[in-house]
Design a protein with these regions (language model features):
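Conserved non-catalytic scaffold segment of RNase H-like nuclease domains
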Residues: 1-88, 98-101, 110-124
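Acidic, Mg2+-coordinating catalytic module of metal-dependent nucleases/exonucleases
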Residues: 61-68, 73, 77, 109-164
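Conserved alpha/beta core surface patches that mediate binding of polyanionic ligands
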Residues: 95
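Short helix/strand-capping connector loops at secondary-structure junctions
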Residues: 161-174
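Conserved small/polar residues in nucleotide/adenosyl-binding loops
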Residues: 178-180
């Protein structure tokens, strides 16, 4: 699943589907995600949605938690399906978190706790819930807070700050978050 952010705000343009893994669900996967063989048996196979997925992420910066792991699985499935591999710009939030908090746990749950992000709906690892949490973690990792603007102060310094912040908010940044 993926969610799209524009200017770090969710657009509600999401990509989500359940997939038939074409093999028996392992005990670990069942415990982690909660999806049974029976539930997944009638779902599409990855090769059937690969083109839609690639179209969705085309030209977008991808924010991924533990990108090496997710990309290895995604690219393996794309290779099997005979599709191009992902070559988007990637931002790995695990790398960002390790740089910011060396020696600390940087799991998604640990980062949610560190930033006081409510993850109580995350009983299982589900793609869209994880993407939503990751978007909030990512924004915190960037230290993106609301700009401090004083609209009553017309000093040249404050006017320049206003111009800078306005131009920042005019930028259109399209990001997708991927979670397998």
């Amino acid at each position: 699943g993926c969610i799209e952010l524009e200017n770090l705000v969710p657009t509600n343009n999401n990509f989500h589907c359940y997939l038939n893994p074409e093999r028996k669900v392992s005990e670990k996967a069942l415990e982690t995600h909660g999806y049974t063989d029976e539930f997944l048996s009638d779902k599409k196979k990855f090769k059937e949605i690969a083109d839609d997925f690639l179209l969705y992420i085309k030209g977008k910066k991808l924010i991924i938690h533990n990108a090496e792991f997710d990309l290895s699985h995604l690219n393996n499935e794309l290779k099997i399906a005979g599709k191009d591999l992902i070559n988007n710009e990637i931002i790995d939030t695990v790398v960002l978190a390790r740089d910011k908090f060396p020696g600390s746990s940087n799991s998604l749950d640990a980062l949610c706790k560190r930033y006081r992000i409510d993850n109580s709906k995350r009983e299982k690892h589900t793609a869209l819930i994880d993407c939503d949490l990751l978007s909030k973690v990512y924004i915190n990792l960037l230290d993106q807070k609301e700009p401090k603007l004083n609209f009553n102060n017309e000093t040249s310094e404050n006017i320049q700050m206003l111009k800078t912040n306005i131009s920042y908010f005019k930028k259109v940044i399209k990001l997708s978050l991927i979670h397998i």
